Regions:
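Short, positively charged patches
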Residues: 1-105
Length: 105
């Protein structure tokens, strides 16, 4: 789940990366964990992802302490639901560029 958290946050905070590109990245990798572990060379093979996008993803990944952020989220009492989860609001799947993840309390 922590990799889904990373992906949901990246969709909102990483430069040049939004919901549409997160969708492309996720479809290519098949899971947030696989995506997190991908190399620069692997990212460059994703159709529709530019060199600037790859740089943004890798910069965000390097600058963000995932373990610390994940522990902070768990302590905060907030929860995350992503598109792959059963309890993701089904109606959101029908809008243009639905959010990858939603935080709730």
């Amino acid at each position: 789940m922590k990799y889904k958290y990373w992906l949901a946050c990246m969709a909102q905070m990483a430069e040049n990366i939004g919901t549409g590109k997160v969708e492309k990245l996720f479809r290519f990798a098949g899971s947030a964990g696989v995506l997190y572990d991908m190399s620069e060379k692997e990212f460059m093979q994703i159709p529709g992802i530019t060199e600037a996008d790859v740089k943004s993803v890798l910069t965000y990944k390097k600058a963000w302490n995932l373990e610390e952020a994940w522990e902070n989220l768990k302590r905060s009492g907030l929860y995350l639901v992503t598109r792959e989860d059963e309890n993701y609001p089904k109606r959101l799947l029908y809008i243009n560029k639905p959010p990858y993840g939603i935080f709730y309390k």
